[in-house]
Amino acid sequence: MIEFQSVSKQYSHDAYALREVSLNIAKGELVYLAGPSGAGKSTLMKMVAAVERPSSGVVTVNGQDIGRIKKAGIPFLRRNLGLIFQHQRLLNDRSILGNVMLPLLVTGAPKTQAEGRARAALDKVGLLDRAKAMPLELSGGEQQRVAVARAIVNRPQIILADEPTANLDRAAADRVLDALRAFHAAGVTCVISTHDDQVLDSASARVIRLEHGQLVGGAV
């Protein structure tokens, strides 16, 4: 489902975000992407979402070569992706329900269908009772769970969660991770990046480690 073949990302003559990375992530797999800040985790995630293109090598997602995909094809690729970032980027002038409905509305879904699916997504993360609340009325952990609901409302094949538990207390972090693991259990491919050792210590899935843009331990 996700394949990197000798992928490098070079920003200047001697500045590499990724260097000769090769890995495979199978359909339905849960993978933790570990490493300190600046290790290249976010760059790897951005390549899967076609936000970044490789300087060399090949990135393939669902059979599509990210380096060759045309700009017009990127929205179609992303319809199969659920993207979750450390900073939720919720719209403060919309309710929680409105935020979760938005990905469906922008693709032309009828409002009634979008609302029904958004309510179902909020129910899955335990926030249906806060549907009418505004983002600033929620805690950081609750806002991150809204971001999870928004990411899964379009029923993606792949969830990319970039540091989803950063700056959360342990209880809030655990609830976010529990939600992501539940989606994985339902068959969704999940890639979760983190530098939190507590998250990794409790991980029962494969861990891919990056340091200075390179895989630790070789190809995976």
Language-model region placement:
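Conserved ABC ATPase signature
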Residues: M134-L138, E142-Q144
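Catalytic Walker B motif of ABC-type/P-loop ATPase nucleotide-binding domains
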Residues: I159-D162
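Conserved ABC transporter NBD signature motif
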Residues: G57-D65
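Helix N-cap at the start of a conserved alpha-helix in ABC-type nucleotide-binding domains
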Residues: R170-A172
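A short, proline-enriched helix->beta-strand linker immediately N-terminal to the Walker B motif
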Residues: V153-Q157
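ABC ATPase NBD coupling module
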Residues: S12, I66-G82, K111, A185
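Helix-to-loop junction immediately C-terminal to a conserved catalytic motif
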Residues: A49
